[in-house]
């Protein structure tokens, strides 16, 4: 399964892309396969937000969350769902659900478990949320 996830990642992610990985990059070292073993096989610049299983690998990520504007929306990126912010991208819940809404609040699960084991991009997220298409700002690299 590891090789299939790597194949699907590289099918979608170009070397120059930036990917926000929302934690649990790899559960623990097994048979000499650690964070660096997997990382060097993946395209893109990976910004890793710490997950609850990242203590078991060598990622050394110190980032607990990221706030970023994508598609004109201020997103909060964190491993666990955060229901105190308006727009949250998370992982952690595996295949329990993909989108949770509470009034104007949205929690979107970007985990591979609910995305056919592919990384998901902002265009797919916006489409899933039935919002207008995301038009990137030409002054950014997003």
Task: Go through the PLM ranges and name each one.
Residues 1-67:
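Core catalytic region of metal-dependent phosphoesterases/phosphodiesterases
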Residues 58-140:
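Conserved beta-sheet core of the metallophosphoesterase superfamily
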């Amino acid at each position: 399964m590891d090789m299939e996830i790597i194949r699907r990642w590289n099918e979608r992610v170009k070397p120059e892309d930036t990917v926000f990985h929302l934690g649990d990059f790899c559960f623990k070292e097994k048979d000499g396969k650690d964070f660096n073993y997997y990382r060097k096989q993946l395209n893109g610049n990976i910004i890793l937000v710490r997950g609850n299983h990242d203590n078991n690998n060598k990622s050394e990520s110190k980032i607990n969350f990221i706030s970023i504007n994508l598609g004109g929306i201020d997103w909060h990126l964190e491993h666990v769902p955060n229901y105190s912010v308006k727009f949250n991208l998370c992982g952690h819940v595996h295949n329990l659900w993909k989108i949770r809404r509470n009034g104007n609040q949205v929690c979107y699960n970007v985990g591979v478990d609910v995305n056919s084991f592919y990384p998901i991009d902002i265009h797919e997220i916006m489409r899933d949320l039935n919002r207008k298409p995301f038009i990137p700002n030409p002054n950014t690299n997003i």
